[in-house]
Protein backbone atom coordinates (compact mmCIF):
# COMPACT_ATOMS: atom_id res chain seq x y z
CA UNK A 1 0.00 0.00 0.00
CA UNK A 2 2.82 2.39 0.84
CA UNK A 3 4.50 1.59 -2.43
CA UNK A 4 1.28 2.29 -4.31
CA UNK A 5 0.92 5.65 -2.55
CA UNK A 6 4.40 6.73 -3.58
CA UNK A 7 3.64 5.82 -7.18
CA UNK A 8 0.37 7.79 -7.26
CA UNK A 9 1.85 10.98 -5.73
CA UNK A 10 3.65 12.19 -8.92
CA UNK A 11 0.49 11.58 -10.91
CA UNK A 12 -1.49 13.77 -8.55
CA UNK A 13 1.09 16.57 -8.86
CA UNK A 14 0.94 16.45 -12.65
CA UNK A 15 -2.81 16.71 -12.57
CA UNK A 16 -2.91 19.74 -10.29
CA UNK A 17 -0.12 21.82 -12.03
CA UNK A 18 -2.01 22.74 -15.27
CA UNK A 19 -4.90 23.96 -13.19
CA UNK A 20 -2.76 26.58 -11.41
CA UNK A 21 -1.05 27.67 -14.70
CA UNK A 22 -4.36 28.12 -16.44
CA UNK A 23 -5.67 30.14 -13.52
CA UNK A 24 -2.64 32.47 -13.69
CA UNK A 25 -3.11 33.01 -17.41
CA UNK A 26 -6.77 33.74 -16.86
CA UNK A 27 -5.86 36.40 -14.28
CA UNK A 28 -3.47 38.12 -16.72
CA UNK A 29 -6.03 37.90 -19.47
CA UNK A 30 -8.63 39.50 -17.24
CA UNK A 31 -6.25 42.36 -16.43
CA UNK A 32 -5.25 42.99 -20.03
CA UNK A 33 -8.67 42.55 -21.47
CA UNK A 34 -10.39 44.74 -18.89
CA UNK A 35 -11.59 48.17 -20.00
CA UNK A 36 -9.33 49.97 -17.51
CA UNK A 37 -9.52 53.77 -17.47
CA UNK A 38 -7.47 56.27 -15.45
CA UNK A 39 -9.69 59.11 -14.32
CA UNK A 40 -7.16 61.96 -14.69
CA UNK A 41 -6.04 61.08 -18.24
CA UNK A 42 -7.35 63.60 -20.80
CA UNK A 43 -9.23 62.39 -23.80
CA UNK A 44 -6.58 62.65 -26.53
CA UNK A 45 -9.05 61.76 -29.21
CA UNK A 46 -11.18 64.70 -28.13
CA UNK A 47 -8.16 67.02 -28.10
CA UNK A 48 -7.13 65.98 -31.58
CA UNK A 49 -10.64 66.34 -32.98
CA UNK A 50 -10.53 69.13 -35.53
CA UNK A 51 -6.78 69.63 -34.98
CA UNK A 52 -5.02 70.84 -38.16
CA UNK A 53 -1.33 70.00 -37.95
CA UNK A 54 -0.59 71.89 -41.16
CA UNK A 55 -1.27 75.26 -39.53
CA UNK A 56 0.74 76.85 -36.77
CA UNK A 57 -0.92 77.70 -33.43
CA UNK A 58 -2.71 81.03 -33.49
CA UNK A 59 -2.47 81.45 -37.24
CA UNK A 60 -3.35 84.98 -38.27
CA UNK A 61 -2.33 86.30 -34.87
CA UNK A 62 0.99 87.02 -33.17
CA UNK A 63 3.95 84.77 -33.93
CA UNK A 64 4.60 81.57 -32.01
CA UNK A 65 7.36 81.87 -29.42
CA UNK A 66 9.66 78.86 -29.55
CA UNK A 67 12.25 78.38 -26.81
CA UNK A 68 15.37 76.42 -27.75
CA UNK A 69 17.88 74.65 -25.54
CA UNK A 70 20.91 72.53 -26.42
CA UNK A 71 22.70 69.72 -24.67
CA UNK A 72 25.92 68.48 -26.26
CA UNK A 73 26.49 64.74 -26.12
CA UNK A 74 29.78 64.61 -28.03
CA UNK A 75 32.01 66.29 -30.59
CA UNK A 76 33.24 63.31 -32.53
CA UNK A 77 35.53 64.69 -35.18
CA UNK A 78 37.11 68.00 -36.22
CA UNK A 79 38.65 68.07 -39.69
CA UNK A 80 40.92 70.88 -40.86
CA UNK A 81 41.16 69.37 -44.34
CA UNK A 82 37.37 69.61 -44.88
CA UNK A 83 36.86 72.49 -42.43
CA UNK A 84 34.05 70.76 -40.56
CA UNK A 85 33.18 69.15 -37.25
CA UNK A 86 30.74 66.42 -36.24
CA UNK A 87 28.56 66.98 -33.17
CA UNK A 88 25.81 65.01 -31.45
CA UNK A 89 23.29 67.18 -29.59
CA UNK A 90 19.96 66.97 -27.83
CA UNK A 91 17.78 69.74 -29.25
CA UNK A 92 14.94 70.79 -26.93
CA UNK A 93 12.12 72.93 -28.33
CA UNK A 94 9.19 74.29 -26.36
CA UNK A 95 6.14 76.25 -27.52
CA UNK A 96 2.47 76.70 -26.60
CA UNK A 97 -0.34 75.23 -28.65
CA UNK A 98 -3.63 76.27 -27.03
CA UNK A 99 -5.54 73.76 -29.14
CA UNK A 100 -4.08 70.97 -26.98
CA UNK A 101 -4.77 72.48 -23.54
CA UNK A 102 -6.83 70.59 -20.94
CA UNK A 103 -8.05 71.69 -17.51
CA UNK A 104 -9.32 68.70 -15.58
CA UNK A 105 -5.84 67.76 -14.27
CA UNK A 106 -2.48 69.38 -13.56
CA UNK A 107 -0.45 66.37 -14.63
CA UNK A 108 2.03 66.56 -17.52
CA UNK A 109 1.61 63.84 -20.10
CA UNK A 110 4.59 61.95 -21.50
CA UNK A 111 3.47 60.75 -24.90
CA UNK A 112 4.76 58.14 -27.30
CA UNK A 113 7.18 59.40 -29.95
CA UNK A 114 4.76 58.28 -32.67
CA UNK A 115 2.34 60.93 -31.46
CA UNK A 116 4.73 63.55 -32.91
CA UNK A 117 3.44 62.81 -36.40
CA UNK A 118 0.03 64.19 -35.42
CA UNK A 119 1.29 67.56 -34.12
CA UNK A 120 2.40 70.82 -35.67
CA UNK A 121 6.18 71.21 -35.22
CA UNK A 122 8.54 74.14 -35.80
CA UNK A 123 10.56 73.62 -38.99
CA UNK A 124 13.88 74.17 -37.27
CA UNK A 125 16.98 73.25 -39.25
CA UNK A 126 20.76 73.60 -38.90
CA UNK A 127 21.84 76.28 -41.35
CA UNK A 128 25.52 75.36 -41.70
CA UNK A 129 25.03 71.58 -41.62
CA UNK A 130 26.56 69.48 -44.39
CA UNK A 131 24.69 66.37 -43.31
CA UNK A 132 22.55 65.29 -40.36
CA UNK A 133 20.54 62.32 -39.16
CA UNK A 134 18.26 61.23 -36.32
CA UNK A 135 18.97 58.30 -34.03
CA UNK A 136 16.52 55.42 -34.00
CA UNK A 137 18.07 52.67 -31.82
CA UNK A 138 16.21 50.98 -30.23
CA UNK A 139 13.37 53.37 -31.01
CA UNK A 140 13.31 56.87 -32.45
CA UNK A 141 15.15 59.12 -30.00
CA UNK A 142 12.31 61.61 -29.62
CA UNK A 143 10.57 62.90 -26.54
CA UNK A 144 7.20 64.65 -26.40
CA UNK A 145 5.51 66.05 -23.30
CA UNK A 146 2.23 67.92 -23.05
CA UNK A 147 1.35 70.28 -20.21
CA UNK A 148 -2.22 71.25 -19.21
CA UNK A 149 -1.85 74.77 -20.60
CA UNK A 150 -0.91 73.39 -24.03
CA UNK A 151 2.85 73.87 -23.70
CA UNK A 152 4.68 71.19 -25.68
CA UNK A 153 8.23 70.04 -25.00
CA UNK A 154 9.78 68.34 -28.00
CA UNK A 155 13.28 66.85 -27.73
CA UNK A 156 15.28 65.02 -30.40
CA UNK A 157 18.77 63.59 -30.68
CA UNK A 158 20.69 64.72 -33.78
CA UNK A 159 24.15 64.00 -35.15
CA UNK A 160 25.29 66.55 -37.69
CA UNK A 161 28.42 67.35 -39.67
CA UNK A 162 28.68 71.13 -39.61
CA UNK A 163 30.85 73.48 -41.65
CA UNK A 164 33.36 75.61 -39.75
CA UNK A 165 35.48 78.25 -41.48
CA UNK A 166 38.99 78.03 -40.06
CA UNK A 167 41.91 80.45 -40.24
CA UNK A 168 45.02 78.25 -40.31
CA UNK A 169 47.63 81.00 -40.57
CA UNK A 170 48.87 80.23 -37.04
CA UNK A 171 48.47 76.45 -37.26
CA UNK A 172 49.18 74.66 -34.91
CA UNK A 173 49.18 77.62 -32.48
CA UNK A 174 45.74 78.65 -33.67
CA UNK A 175 42.37 79.18 -32.03
CA UNK A 176 39.19 78.56 -34.00
CA UNK A 177 35.61 79.71 -33.54
CA UNK A 178 32.93 77.32 -34.77
CA UNK A 179 29.20 77.92 -34.85
CA UNK A 180 25.96 75.98 -34.80
CA UNK A 181 23.22 78.05 -36.46
CA UNK A 182 19.54 77.21 -35.92
CA UNK A 183 16.83 78.82 -38.00
CA UNK A 184 13.29 78.33 -39.24
CA UNK A 185 13.28 77.08 -42.80
CA UNK A 186 9.88 78.29 -43.95
CA UNK A 187 8.39 80.52 -41.25
CA UNK A 188 9.48 84.14 -41.15
CA UNK A 189 9.59 86.34 -38.06
CA UNK A 190 5.91 87.14 -38.61
CA UNK A 191 4.99 83.54 -37.84
CA UNK A 192 7.66 82.28 -35.45
CA UNK A 193 10.14 83.81 -33.01
CA UNK A 194 13.08 81.86 -31.61
CA UNK A 195 14.75 82.65 -28.32
CA UNK A 196 17.13 80.83 -26.03
CA UNK A 197 15.46 79.14 -23.11
CA UNK A 198 15.80 80.78 -19.70
CA UNK A 199 17.44 77.59 -18.47
CA UNK A 200 20.07 77.82 -21.22
CA UNK A 201 22.64 79.68 -19.13
CA UNK A 202 25.17 77.00 -19.92
CA UNK A 203 25.37 74.09 -22.29
CA UNK A 204 25.16 70.85 -20.40
CA UNK A 205 27.86 68.40 -21.38
CA UNK A 206 30.10 70.88 -23.19
CA UNK A 207 32.32 71.53 -20.18
CA UNK A 208 32.87 67.80 -19.69
CA UNK A 209 34.00 67.03 -23.23
CA UNK A 210 37.54 65.76 -23.73
CA UNK A 211 38.76 66.35 -27.28
CA UNK A 212 41.92 64.85 -28.75
CA UNK A 213 43.29 67.95 -30.48
CA UNK A 214 41.35 70.87 -29.01
CA UNK A 215 40.22 72.41 -25.75
CA UNK A 216 36.93 74.31 -25.56
CA UNK A 217 37.84 77.59 -23.87
CA UNK A 218 34.52 79.48 -24.02
CA UNK A 219 31.14 79.68 -25.72
CA UNK A 220 28.37 82.23 -26.16
CA UNK A 221 24.84 82.54 -27.55
CA UNK A 222 23.60 85.05 -30.11
CA UNK A 223 20.20 85.91 -31.57
CA UNK A 224 19.71 87.78 -34.83
CA UNK A 225 17.29 88.36 -37.68
CA UNK A 226 18.47 87.30 -41.12
CA UNK A 227 17.07 89.50 -43.86
CA UNK A 228 16.32 87.82 -47.20
CA UNK A 229 14.97 90.09 -49.92
CA UNK A 230 12.80 87.42 -51.48
CA UNK A 231 11.34 85.89 -48.30
CA UNK A 232 11.61 88.44 -45.50
CA UNK A 233 13.25 88.23 -42.09
CA UNK A 234 14.01 84.92 -40.44
CA UNK A 235 15.05 84.45 -36.80
CA UNK A 236 18.37 82.71 -36.20
CA UNK A 237 19.96 81.44 -32.99
CA UNK A 238 23.67 80.69 -32.97
CA UNK A 239 26.00 78.89 -30.62
CA UNK A 240 29.61 80.10 -30.85
CA UNK A 241 32.35 78.09 -29.15
CA UNK A 242 36.08 78.74 -29.08
CA UNK A 243 38.52 75.90 -29.75
CA UNK A 244 42.18 76.14 -28.77
CA UNK A 245 44.45 73.58 -30.37
CA UNK A 246 46.53 71.38 -28.08
CA UNK A 247 50.15 71.95 -29.11
CA UNK A 248 51.76 69.07 -27.25
CA UNK A 249 51.17 66.46 -29.94
CA UNK A 250 52.56 68.77 -32.64
CA UNK A 251 55.66 69.57 -30.62
CA UNK A 252 56.34 65.85 -30.30
CA UNK A 253 55.43 64.87 -33.87
CA UNK A 254 56.69 67.85 -35.89
CA UNK A 255 58.78 70.39 -34.00
CA UNK A 256 61.08 68.09 -32.05
CA UNK A 257 61.98 65.90 -35.06
CA UNK A 258 62.76 69.05 -37.05
CA UNK A 259 65.03 70.40 -34.32
CA UNK A 260 66.82 67.06 -34.02
CA UNK A 261 67.37 66.92 -37.79
CA UNK A 262 68.90 70.39 -37.75
CA UNK A 263 71.15 69.42 -34.84
CA UNK A 264 72.10 66.23 -36.68
CA UNK A 265 73.23 68.27 -39.67
CA UNK A 266 75.65 70.13 -37.38
CA UNK A 267 77.48 66.88 -36.59
CA UNK A 268 79.26 67.22 -39.94
CA UNK A 269 81.15 70.25 -38.58
CA UNK A 270 83.09 67.89 -36.29
CA UNK A 271 83.86 65.35 -39.03
CA UNK A 272 87.19 65.63 -40.82
CA UNK A 273 87.30 67.34 -44.19
CA UNK A 274 88.96 64.25 -45.62
CA UNK A 275 85.89 62.09 -44.81
CA UNK A 276 84.01 63.14 -47.92
CA UNK A 277 81.53 60.18 -48.07
CA UNK A 278 80.57 60.57 -44.41
CA UNK A 279 79.86 64.30 -44.60
CA UNK A 280 78.08 64.17 -47.95
CA UNK A 281 75.85 61.23 -46.96
CA UNK A 282 74.97 62.89 -43.65
CA UNK A 283 74.03 66.14 -45.38
CA UNK A 284 71.92 64.48 -48.07
CA UNK A 285 70.19 62.22 -45.53
CA UNK A 286 69.13 65.14 -43.34
CA UNK A 287 67.86 67.10 -46.34
CA UNK A 288 65.78 64.18 -47.64
CA UNK A 289 64.43 63.35 -44.17
CA UNK A 290 63.39 66.96 -43.68
CA UNK A 291 61.59 66.89 -47.03
CA UNK A 292 59.72 63.71 -46.05
CA UNK A 293 58.67 65.24 -42.73
CA UNK A 294 57.32 68.33 -44.49
CA UNK A 295 55.28 66.30 -46.98
CA UNK A 296 53.79 63.99 -44.33
CA UNK A 297 52.78 66.89 -42.09
CA UNK A 298 51.01 68.70 -44.93
CA UNK A 299 49.04 65.66 -46.06
CA UNK A 300 46.36 66.16 -43.38
CA UNK A 301 45.89 69.87 -44.10
CA UNK A 302 43.86 71.64 -46.77
CA UNK A 303 45.67 73.11 -49.74
CA UNK A 304 45.06 76.65 -48.63
CA UNK A 305 46.81 79.69 -50.01
CA UNK A 306 47.72 80.95 -46.55
CA UNK A 307 51.19 80.11 -45.26
CA UNK A 308 50.85 78.27 -41.97
CA UNK A 309 53.13 78.62 -38.95
CA UNK A 310 54.19 74.99 -39.24
CA UNK A 311 55.20 75.55 -42.87
CA UNK A 312 57.34 78.50 -41.83
CA UNK A 313 59.13 76.42 -39.20
CA UNK A 314 59.69 73.55 -41.61
CA UNK A 315 61.27 75.90 -44.13
CA UNK A 316 63.46 77.46 -41.45
CA UNK A 317 64.77 74.01 -40.53
CA UNK A 318 65.12 73.07 -44.19
CA UNK A 319 67.25 76.15 -44.87
CA UNK A 320 69.55 75.37 -41.93
CA UNK A 321 69.92 71.73 -42.98
CA UNK A 322 70.67 72.71 -46.56
CA UNK A 323 73.07 75.44 -45.39
CA UNK A 324 75.05 72.82 -43.44
CA UNK A 325 75.48 70.85 -46.66
CA UNK A 326 76.52 73.98 -48.57
CA UNK A 327 79.00 74.83 -45.80
CA UNK A 328 80.85 71.57 -46.39
CA UNK A 329 80.89 72.20 -50.14
CA UNK A 330 82.40 75.64 -49.54
CA UNK A 331 84.94 74.35 -47.01
CA UNK A 332 85.92 71.45 -49.26
CA UNK A 333 86.37 73.82 -52.22
CA UNK A 334 88.69 76.02 -50.16
CA UNK A 335 90.70 73.02 -48.96
CA UNK A 336 91.04 71.69 -52.49
CA UNK A 337 92.01 75.12 -53.80
CA UNK A 338 94.72 75.52 -51.18
CA UNK A 339 96.17 72.11 -52.06
CA UNK A 340 96.29 72.95 -55.76
CA UNK A 341 97.82 76.36 -55.06
CA UNK A 342 100.56 74.87 -52.89
CA UNK A 343 101.36 72.27 -55.55
CA UNK A 344 101.50 74.97 -58.21
CA UNK A 345 103.84 77.10 -56.12
CA UNK A 346 106.16 74.13 -55.62
CA UNK A 347 106.37 73.59 -59.40
CA UNK A 348 106.68 77.23 -60.49
CA UNK A 349 109.19 78.38 -57.86
CA UNK A 350 112.25 76.39 -59.19
CA UNK A 351 111.32 77.37 -62.72
CA UNK A 352 111.17 81.04 -61.78
CA UNK A 353 114.51 80.85 -60.01
CA UNK A 354 116.05 79.23 -63.10
CA UNK A 355 114.62 81.97 -65.33
CA UNK A 356 116.13 84.61 -63.07
CA UNK A 357 119.52 82.93 -63.15
CA UNK A 358 119.40 82.68 -66.94
CA UNK A 359 118.48 86.34 -67.18
CA UNK A 360 121.37 87.31 -64.91
CA UNK A 361 123.82 85.22 -66.96
CA UNK A 362 122.48 86.68 -70.16
CA UNK A 363 122.75 90.12 -68.69
CA UNK A 364 126.35 89.48 -67.62
CA UNK A 365 127.34 88.16 -71.03
CA UNK A 366 125.61 90.99 -72.78
CA UNK A 367 127.20 93.53 -70.48
CA UNK A 368 130.65 92.02 -71.07
CA UNK A 369 130.17 92.12 -74.84
CA UNK A 370 128.95 95.66 -74.76
CA UNK A 371 131.87 96.75 -72.57
CA UNK A 372 134.36 95.17 -74.96
CA UNK A 373 132.74 96.83 -77.95
CA UNK A 374 132.67 100.15 -76.12
CA UNK A 375 136.36 99.90 -75.43
CA UNK A 376 137.11 99.28 -79.10
CA UNK A 377 134.85 102.12 -80.09
CA UNK A 378 136.56 104.51 -77.69
CA UNK A 379 139.87 103.69 -79.25
CA UNK A 380 138.36 104.50 -82.63
CA UNK A 381 136.74 107.63 -81.21
CA UNK A 382 133.02 106.62 -81.64
CA UNK A 383 130.23 105.03 -79.52
CA UNK A 384 127.37 103.48 -81.52
CA UNK A 385 123.87 104.28 -80.14
CA UNK A 386 122.50 100.81 -80.74
CA UNK A 387 124.95 99.39 -78.19
CA UNK A 388 123.72 101.70 -75.45
CA UNK A 389 120.10 100.86 -76.36
CA UNK A 390 120.73 97.15 -76.25
CA UNK A 391 122.51 97.52 -72.93
CA UNK A 392 119.54 99.30 -71.44
CA UNK A 393 117.06 96.81 -72.91
CA UNK A 394 118.93 93.86 -71.47
CA UNK A 395 119.05 95.56 -68.08
CA UNK A 396 115.36 96.35 -68.13
CA UNK A 397 114.49 92.80 -69.22
CA UNK A 398 116.56 91.37 -66.40
CA UNK A 399 114.75 93.58 -63.91
CA UNK A 400 111.41 92.51 -65.31
CA UNK A 401 112.34 88.87 -65.00
CA UNK A 402 113.37 89.42 -61.44
CA UNK A 403 110.27 91.43 -60.47
CA UNK A 404 107.54 89.39 -62.17
CA UNK A 405 107.94 86.23 -60.18
CA UNK A 406 104.67 84.49 -59.50
CA UNK A 407 103.54 84.87 -55.98
CA UNK A 408 105.57 88.00 -55.45
CA UNK A 409 104.69 90.45 -52.75
CA UNK A 410 102.94 92.76 -55.20
CA UNK A 411 100.69 90.10 -56.85
CA UNK A 412 96.90 90.10 -56.61
CA UNK A 413 96.65 86.44 -55.66
CA UNK A 414 98.80 87.00 -52.62
CA UNK A 415 96.18 89.38 -51.27
CA UNK A 416 93.24 86.92 -51.88
CA UNK A 417 94.22 84.11 -49.59
CA UNK A 418 91.57 81.32 -49.25
CA UNK A 419 90.24 80.58 -45.76
CA UNK A 420 91.38 77.36 -44.17
CA UNK A 421 88.67 74.65 -44.23
CA UNK A 422 89.12 73.76 -40.58
CA UNK A 423 88.66 77.42 -39.69
CA UNK A 424 85.35 77.46 -41.57
CA UNK A 425 84.15 74.44 -39.58
CA UNK A 426 85.18 76.09 -36.30
CA UNK A 427 83.18 79.21 -37.15
CA UNK A 428 80.19 77.11 -38.27
CA UNK A 429 80.09 75.27 -34.94
CA UNK A 430 79.27 78.54 -33.22
CA UNK A 431 77.40 80.50 -35.90
CA UNK A 432 74.82 77.85 -36.87
CA UNK A 433 73.48 77.09 -33.34
CA UNK A 434 73.44 80.78 -32.41
CA UNK A 435 71.56 81.75 -35.57
CA UNK A 436 69.07 78.88 -35.13
CA UNK A 437 68.38 79.88 -31.52
CA UNK A 438 67.82 83.51 -32.53
CA UNK A 439 65.40 82.53 -35.30
CA UNK A 440 63.47 80.28 -32.87
CA UNK A 441 63.07 83.13 -30.39
CA UNK A 442 61.66 85.36 -33.13
CA UNK A 443 59.40 82.59 -34.44
CA UNK A 444 57.82 81.62 -31.11
CA UNK A 445 57.42 85.25 -30.08
CA UNK A 446 55.63 86.07 -33.34
CA UNK A 447 53.18 83.15 -33.32
CA UNK A 448 52.37 82.76 -29.64
CA UNK A 449 51.80 86.36 -28.63
Swiss-Prot record:
<dbReference type="GO" id="GO:0005886">
    <property type="term" value="C:plasma membrane"/>
</dbReference>
<feature type="glycosylation site" description="N-linked (GlcNAc...) asparagine">
    <location>
        <position position="106"/>
    </location>
</feature>
<dbReference type="GO" id="GO:0007214">
    <property type="term" value="P:gamma-aminobutyric acid signaling pathway"/>
</dbReference>
<dbReference type="InterPro" id="IPR006028">
    <property type="entry name" value="GABAA/Glycine_rcpt"/>
</dbReference>
<feature type="signal peptide">
    <location>
        <begin position="1"/>
        <end position="24"/>
    </location>
</feature>
<feature type="transmembrane region" description="Helical">
    <location>
        <begin position="424"/>
        <end position="446"/>
    </location>
</feature>
<dbReference type="GO" id="GO:0030425">
    <property type="term" value="C:dendrite"/>
</dbReference>
<keyword id="KW-0407">Ion channel</keyword>
<dbReference type="GO" id="GO:0030424">
    <property type="term" value="C:axon"/>
</dbReference>
<dbReference type="InterPro" id="IPR008098">
    <property type="entry name" value="GABAAd_rcpt"/>
</dbReference>
<keyword id="KW-0732">Signal</keyword>
<dbReference type="InterPro" id="IPR038050">
    <property type="entry name" value="Neuro_actylchol_rec"/>
</dbReference>
<dbReference type="GO" id="GO:0034707">
    <property type="term" value="C:chloride channel complex"/>
</dbReference>
<comment type="similarity">
    <text>Belongs to the ligand-gated ion channel (TC 1.A.9) family. Gamma-aminobutyric acid receptor (TC 1.A.9.5) subfamily. GABRD sub-subfamily.</text>
</comment>
<dbReference type="GO" id="GO:0098978">
    <property type="term" value="C:glutamatergic synapse"/>
</dbReference>
<feature type="topological domain" description="Extracellular">
    <location>
        <begin position="25"/>
        <end position="251"/>
    </location>
</feature>
<feature type="transmembrane region" description="Helical">
    <location>
        <begin position="276"/>
        <end position="298"/>
    </location>
</feature>
<keyword id="KW-1003">Cell membrane</keyword>
<dbReference type="Pfam" id="PF02932">
    <property type="entry name" value="Neur_chan_memb"/>
</dbReference>
<comment type="function">
    <text>Delta subunit of the heteropentameric ligand-gated chloride channel gated by gamma-aminobutyric acid (GABA), a major inhibitory neurotransmitter in the brain. GABA-gated chloride channels, also named GABA(A) receptors (GABAAR), consist of five subunits arranged around a central pore and contain GABA active binding site(s) located at the alpha and beta subunit interface(s). When activated by GABA, GABAARs selectively allow the flow of chloride anions across the cell membrane down their electrochemical gradient.</text>
</comment>
<dbReference type="InterPro" id="IPR006029">
    <property type="entry name" value="Neurotrans-gated_channel_TM"/>
</dbReference>
<dbReference type="GO" id="GO:1904315">
    <property type="term" value="F:transmitter-gated monoatomic ion channel activity involved in regulation of postsynaptic membrane potential"/>
</dbReference>
<dbReference type="InterPro" id="IPR006202">
    <property type="entry name" value="Neur_chan_lig-bd"/>
</dbReference>
<comment type="subunit">
    <text>Heteropentamer, formed by a combination of alpha (GABRA1-6), beta (GABRB1-3), gamma (GABRG1-3), delta (GABRD), epsilon (GABRE), rho (GABRR1-3), pi (GABRP) and theta (GABRQ) chains, each subunit exhibiting distinct physiological and pharmacological properties.</text>
</comment>
<feature type="disulfide bond">
    <location>
        <begin position="164"/>
        <end position="178"/>
    </location>
</feature>
<dbReference type="InterPro" id="IPR018000">
    <property type="entry name" value="Neurotransmitter_ion_chnl_CS"/>
</dbReference>
<dbReference type="GO" id="GO:0005254">
    <property type="term" value="F:chloride channel activity"/>
</dbReference>
<keyword id="KW-0869">Chloride channel</keyword>
<dbReference type="GO" id="GO:0098982">
    <property type="term" value="C:GABA-ergic synapse"/>
</dbReference>
<dbReference type="GO" id="GO:0043025">
    <property type="term" value="C:neuronal cell body"/>
</dbReference>
<feature type="modified residue" description="Phosphoserine">
    <location>
        <position position="390"/>
    </location>
</feature>
<dbReference type="GO" id="GO:1902711">
    <property type="term" value="C:GABA-A receptor complex"/>
</dbReference>
<keyword id="KW-0472">Membrane</keyword>
<feature type="topological domain" description="Extracellular">
    <location>
        <begin position="447"/>
        <end position="449"/>
    </location>
</feature>
<feature type="transmembrane region" description="Helical">
    <location>
        <begin position="309"/>
        <end position="331"/>
    </location>
</feature>
<dbReference type="GO" id="GO:0004890">
    <property type="term" value="F:GABA-A receptor activity"/>
</dbReference>
<keyword id="KW-0325">Glycoprotein</keyword>
<keyword id="KW-0597">Phosphoprotein</keyword>
<dbReference type="GO" id="GO:1902476">
    <property type="term" value="P:chloride transmembrane transport"/>
</dbReference>
<feature type="topological domain" description="Extracellular">
    <location>
        <begin position="299"/>
        <end position="308"/>
    </location>
</feature>
<dbReference type="InterPro" id="IPR006201">
    <property type="entry name" value="Neur_channel"/>
</dbReference>
<dbReference type="Pfam" id="PF02931">
    <property type="entry name" value="Neur_chan_LBD"/>
</dbReference>
